[in-house]
């Protein structure tokens, strides 16, 4: 009888341990992460051209997710009010809205986007529509250049 109780106790312990492990598991998106060293978002923000074309791993809290296709994440910087966008090819990786507020590690290539005024208008109009916000074309003064991470893989902690 005592052997049966011990066996039952061990089985219950294993079930609980395995269940807890699956709940605590990281969510993986896209390719597995290969870099070990995290590059601070603030370093990229400070000198973005130094990082263009380079593979980096960033880490931070997800502050926004594309509501239409889950095709990008905005990752909070390690400095106040800063953020950096991680974009994926539409449909290749789909980030869930539940990623907001979680810590993400995202790996990819830093890219520079140079937009003409017309492209910048279309870009900002599209983002306003995604967020359900009004768009004033007068806010776009001319061509724009910005930087983002072309994400290849990510983990939500």
Where are these regions (language model features)?
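OB-fold and OB-like single-stranded nucleic-acid-recognition modules
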Residues: 24-157
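N-terminal secretory signal peptides that target proteins for export/translocation
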Residues: 1-6
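Bacterial N-terminal signal peptides
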Residues: 9-20
């Amino acid at each position: 009888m005592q052997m049966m109780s011990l066996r039952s106790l061990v089985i219950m312990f294993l079930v609980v341990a395995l269940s807890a492990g699956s709940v605590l598991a990281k969510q993986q998106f896209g390719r597995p992460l290969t870099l070990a060293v995290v590059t601070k978002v603030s370093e990229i923000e400070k000198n973005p051209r130094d990082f263009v074309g380079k593979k980096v791993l960033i880490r931070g809290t997800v502050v926004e997710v594309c509501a239409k296709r889950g095709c990008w994440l905005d990752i909070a910087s390690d400095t106040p009010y800063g953020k950096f966008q991680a974009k994926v090819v539409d449909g290749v990786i789909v980030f869930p809205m539940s990623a907001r507020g979680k810590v993400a590690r995202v790996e990819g290539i830093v890219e520079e986007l140079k937009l003409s005024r017309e492209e910048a208008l279309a870009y900002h109009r599209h983002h306003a529509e995604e967020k359900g916000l009004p768009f004033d074309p007068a806010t776009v003064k001319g061509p724009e250049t910005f930087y983002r991470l072309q994400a290849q893989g990510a983990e939500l902690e």
